[in-house]
Amino acid sequence: MSGGKSGSRLSAYSHLKEIGKGGFGVVYAAQRENGEKVAIKRIDKKVPKNRVWTEIQTMKELKKSKYVVEFYEDFVEDGYTYIVMELCEGGSLQAYVREHGALDDATAVHVLRQLISAVSFMHRVNVIHRDLSAGNVFIKDSKKKKMTVKLGDFGLATTLGRGETTCTIVGTPGFIAPQVYDQEYTQSADVYSLGAVLYTMLTARNPPPKGLPPTCGMSPNAARLVEQMMDTDAKKRIPLTQIVLSEFMYENTNENAVIFSREHSRDGRRQRSREPVRSSRDDRSRDGRALIRSSSQPAHSGRAPLSNRPIHDRMPSTSSRGFDSERGRERDRDSGRGTVPPSREDRNRSQLWPIRMDRLEGQRVCTAGGRYIVELDTRCRFEVAAQGNFVKRILIVEVDEMVQTVYVHRIPDRTVRGRNGEEELITLTNNPFVYTSYSQMPKEVQNDYMRLQKMVAVTISGRVAKVTFRRPSQFPDAQAQLMENGDLRIKLPRSVIVRKMDNGEIFNCIDGIATQKQAVSGITLTKVNEVYKYLIRFEQCLNGMDRGMVCFPIVFSAGTNMVGSSPSSLMPSGSSQTSRFPFSNLSNNQPSLVPHSAPFLTKPTSSQRASSANVQRRVSTDENSSPSVAPSKYKIKIDPTTQKVRSIQATDGRVLRCSTSKADQFIFTDPAIRPDDQRFMRTDRVPDRASEMLHTLCERMRKLHQ
């Protein structure tokens, strides 16, 4: 195909070569006048114009996602519609596995994580792909274990909510959810298709048109995830947001994981090798690098599968190992310390990627190596200091629906000095390096990331109380706190008893000074372990609540008959519930937050009882206060003349302004993501990270007009 007539839009492209052909048109590789390689899709004249328009609008809408084939431009010549887009020279994922064979588990997980990010972005803007298959996943970079892919071909995509959205049979056989054939489907159909793509990556074969595909030859966790994603019952199908929590994803994101090699016999059947192949990180670990031998990455863990954990509380339970195990009882007898929970290594391993920051917002720590700040429950930063207290780079870690992205902003040498905890944030650069997995990062960034992860998981989490038990019967003049990192603190009038989670060590800090430690023994040791066991079980009960209920942090007090009782026996039940387990009503204006769906809480039978069963969550108390926490997350500016709200600014530099030229238009600036302003109407899709600011701004405007 030639580049078109002189002077035409198509003539600006040369070296056109056909690289693909489908029912709706032909795709060419081409070259721009500046030498840039692109892909050009020529859509057949017979394709309905509304479908062409939908594909173009969808690509424009998804342009912000880095895992979607980027849209450049479109034009019409001689009745044909041309779409110019990013060229992925590696071809389709389907063609790649046919030529090179199945991917190993680690590479498949790396690709799946990118596709989850792309589909999550699509669903946030209410788009269903409807033809998500291995043939529509294109390879940008096929380097081993770092394969970069892009999702493309949105010719069948549609917006959720339109008349024909859930009642049209489209897609590629084998990748189509059963609900599509029934002409009743939602976004979960894309999850089924993602499962089919995962199956193709692991087997180099397309799944059968109907029924669950055979999973022989896969690792057990891989087979389990494929079955969960391709469950024929949409209601039982694993949600998109929980795929990253599966054991298969976890074990192949952690660099110490075993990767199963796959061999193909002459008849094409795949067999699992008897010898496990260690990831490249295991090979690197032999040279003695400190990063590889970090205590936060043990080779083995006794934790429960992530897929079995409640999603509503993303911080792992401090009680993921059973207390009645034989080995635990032996430790109890030998040490006299009582129950020994999972080690800090186990917890840090589960928090390596993504970093879990729930309920840690506002915490700051300054050290000689830099400043650590948890800006939001989904965003933290590390301002890395070099010699002379000059900042050399800033790591920003953001978690969106359990998909984590790391932005690295490099600061010119000796231009910015480190700041104290109370001082304002350092301005970020406009062109950060972006990483979506641990293995992508260079060694120096990996070291910085591990320092940040350890600071959040150990030090900062140890400052925030998750459960506060006021006046336990063992220590009537004290309060016991189970911290976010699993430590126990019992605050007495003149001292603080601490029980460390990682090694079970128990000591008493006189006057709260860590250097003045005293050993704890005898009856006091027994009482400490009783309180600890009780709080662990209490936390377990709360973790069993409905997924939509966020219960932590929680503050409560109990009666005097707690010793030897289980949490469930002490919770309200029957006519005596008021006197047996009264939750402290910390605020007279706080409505009852007792979740009626909790397995161990009973709905009060009268208003009198309800007043004694009030639970306050997310309270601002001394337990969770930090001297560095800002009094407010946002700063609102009001025009002194008109008394109208002009803008709202977040502590991390984001600014949302009201447009002065057009009513109901807003201007959003997010220097951490992009330097330019984003304008949008109130009825448009709100940019990422602006939703909460817009809600706060509108609420303030509404109150001013009352």
Curated annotation (Swiss-Prot):
Catalyzed reactions:
L-seryl-[protein] + ATP = O-phospho-L-seryl-[protein] + ADP + H(+); L-threonyl-[protein] + ATP = O-phospho-L-threonyl-[protein] + ADP + H(+)
User: Is NADP among this UniProt entry's keywords?
Assistant: no
Task: Look up the coiled coil feature and give its residue ranges.
Answer: none
Active site, per annotation? D131 (proton acceptor)
Which residues are noted in the entry as ATP-binding? I19, G20, K21, G22, G23, F24, G25, V26, V27, K41
Q: Which UniProt keywords apply?
A: ATP-binding, Cell cycle, Cytoplasm, Cytoskeleton, Developmental protein, Kinase, Nucleotide-binding, Serine/threonine-protein kinase, Transferase, Ubl conjugation
Q: How does it assemble?
A: Interacts with sel-10.
Q: What is this protein called?
A: Probable serine/threonine-protein kinase zyg-1
Gene source species: Caenorhabditis elegans
